[in-house]
From Swiss-Prot:
Keywords: Cytoplasm, Elongation factor, Protein biosynthesis. Residues 79-82 are annotated as: Involved in Mg(2+) ion dislocation from EF-Tu. This is Elongation factor Ts. It comes from Xanthomonas axonopodis pv. citri (strain 306). Associates with the EF-Tu.GDP complex and induces the exchange of GDP to GTP. It remains bound to the aminoacyl-tRNA.EF-Tu.GTP complex up to the GTP hydrolysis stage on the ribosome. PROSITE patterns: EF_TS_1, EF_TS_2. One of its GO terms (cellular component) is cytoplasm.
């Protein structure tokens, strides 16, 4: 069968693969466009396997929401350049929407979720890898599903937050989500802070004190330490931090003024916890030349 330009174009539109790859696929499969599409998918999977050991620490946070049900997903690429590629961006939206419409509890479960096209997320990932030429990973998925106010906020594609707020309104929930994106509090309130953390901070503060302060009466010493610990706890709790949208009050004051309560939140930032590999090519060349 003759491999026409229109046939190559049709396969390219269907798969998104490059023109030469589409032509090769059609030649390999005697012009059968369905077989060629499958061949490209398998080729994509092979390429994905070859790139699997490459560090993917860039990427994007995407969200999808329907009422009180919302998700955040982190999809990683190797470079910031690919993180801005239209194929990559489209894939992150596909992943977020698939997560929202499934009951997948985590990124691993999300891999096997089927799309309307019949592909799984994992198969689509492999196809996008074939297009962009980098290792891509669907790394994390978090969700909130509640009858309370739920706000989803993504800042610059790099940081995403979900907030569940009992009472108040969605505007307040969104404001709190923006605060969490900016300030990254580890905990909601003081009672959530682990006792081990507080005990360790007390040790540190005591060690930092001068001998003169340590010689003060026990009750005065306790007040000094308690004041320092209270300040530290405020710094690591959402409720204790000055509200970024109105620094004249804390988040707790803003929430209580609305008769509300923060039930919980989720925050994701691109690449957090991933050790990036920094290549020193000059040192590598010198090493190979026996000069280092």
């Amino acid at each position: 069968m003759e491999i026409t330009a229109s046939l190559v174009k049709e396969l390219r539109e269907r798969t998104g693969a490059g023109m030469m790859e589409c032509k090769k696929a059609l030649v390999e499969n005697a012009g059968d466009i369905d077989a060629a599409a499958e061949w490209l998918r398998k080729s994509g999977l092979a390429k994905a396997d070859k790139k699997a050991d490459r560090v993917a620490a860039e990427g994007r946070i995407a969200t999808a929401q329907a009422g009180g049900k919302a998700v955040l997903v982190e999809v990683n690429s190797e470079t910031d350049f690919v993180a801005k590629d239209e194929n990559f961006l489209a894939f992150t939206e596909v992943v977020a929407n698939a997560a929202l419409n499934s009951d997948a509890a985590d990124a691993e479960a999300l891999k096997s979720v089927k799309l309307d096209s019949g592909e799984t997320i994992e198969e689509r990932r492999a196809a996008v890898i074939a297009k962009v030429g980098e290792n891509l990973q669907v790394r994390r998925l978090v969700r909130i599903d509640s009858a309370n106010n739920v706000a989803a906020y993504v800042h610059g594609g790099r940081i995403g937050v979900l907030v569940e707020l009992k009472g108040g309104d969605i505007e307040l929930a969104r404001g709190i989500a923006m605060h969490i994106a900016a300030m990254n509090p580890p905990h909601v309130k003081a009672s959530d802070v682990p006792a081990e953390f507080v005990a360790k901070e007390k040790e540190i503060e005591l060690a930092k004190m001068s001998e003169k302060d340590k010689a003060k009466p026990a009750e005065i010493l306790e007040k000094i330490i308690s004041g320092k610990i209270s300040k530290i706890v405020n710094e690591v709790t959402l409720y204790g931090q000055p509200y970024v949208l109105n620094t004249d009050q804390t988040v707790e004051q803003a929430v209580k003024a609305a008769g509300a309560e923060v039930i919980g939140f989720q925050r994701l930032a691109v690449g957090e916890g991933i050790e990036k590999v920094v290549e020193d090519y000059a040192a590598e060349v010198m090493k190979q030349a026996g000069l280092a």
